[in-house]
Amino acid sequence: MILKNISIINYKNIKAANLELSPKINCLIGHNGVGKTNFLDAIYYLSFCRSAYNPIDSQVIAHDENFMVIEGNYLDERENVENIFCGMKRGTKKHFKRNKKEYKRLSQHIGLIPLIFVSPSDTILIEGGSEERRRLMDVVISQYDPSYIEALSNYNKALQQRNALLKMEEEPDVTLMEIWEQEMARNGELLFQKREAFVKELIPLFQQIYRHISGDREVVSLRYVSHCQRGPLLDVIQRDRFKDRAVGYSLHGVHRDDLEMLIGDFLMKREGSQGQNKTFVLALKLAQFDFLRRTVSSTTPLLLLDDIFDKLDAQRVEAIVDLVSGANFGQIFITDTNRDHLDRILHESDGNYRIFHVEGGNIDLAHEE
């Protein structure tokens, strides 16, 4: 999928932008805090119906403005044009349309425009809690498996209902409790199977890319951990119902799954240096891109690279440049404060690129070939 052009109105600090884009490499240059990341986030929004950073939709509307609009025209592999529109006013729900027709459910849109976003905040995958790593799995799998989205929604609904029963002062209805436990188990087993299969396929891709970037300096891996590995999920959930009642929430289930990130036999969060951590998450995201490219056979994902070169040594930067300049990558958006990094990528490219200068939310074409 190729984003041909994009129009943005009142999205964060971008008051107005109307840009024609390169089908290969698009570079955005500017100081920190001028709007480069906000531009990438607007592209992300058109793929996922939400911001990568702001959980509340109204937070993306520019200050002192009452509405925002993002509209993009995409070209698929058959050269069909897909028009994607999102508009929202403060205090009302957003409108999301494909070719002028509004979606009944936003989940119907997920996966149409596969995308991987690599940003400095990705280090939270190593440093943060397990919810960040579960979200990583959810975001990728949801882009190629609609049944996963449905199972995840059903599981979370059942979990919420069971937790509400656990919090009750009086003794909850056992029959009702069992209904929600069965719903959790049924959907949870499906989520476990799909996560397990995804991680199994992702590991060799991830290790290969990490070796390329690091120059074979370290051995890394991933380990998926789930309560489903202890036996049938329904048994695991019901086994400690008394403890769950005492704390007021569900202690077991796939909502507690984790994706352990390892260097050698140790957790990255304890052993990894700053450069190793950044290399790890970058390789992980690029492996997700490669996985989606192989899995979603009808289209190549968009790749957003936000300030990825900071805190990496020259050898790793060179390896990344070599990697993303290859034929396996489709349309790429790259931001940086340092023009030198981008020039090296452009030198390796086939010459099809555009450079945009960003300042104070204004985005202007600086150069194209």
Residue map of PLM features:
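Conserved lysine of the Walker
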Residues: 36
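Post-Walker A helix-loop "phosphate-sensing" segment adjacent to the P-loop in P-loop NTPases
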Residues: 44-56, 287-295
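Nucleotide-state sensing region of NTPase/ATPase domains
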Residues: 48-126, 130-132, 138-144, 148, ...
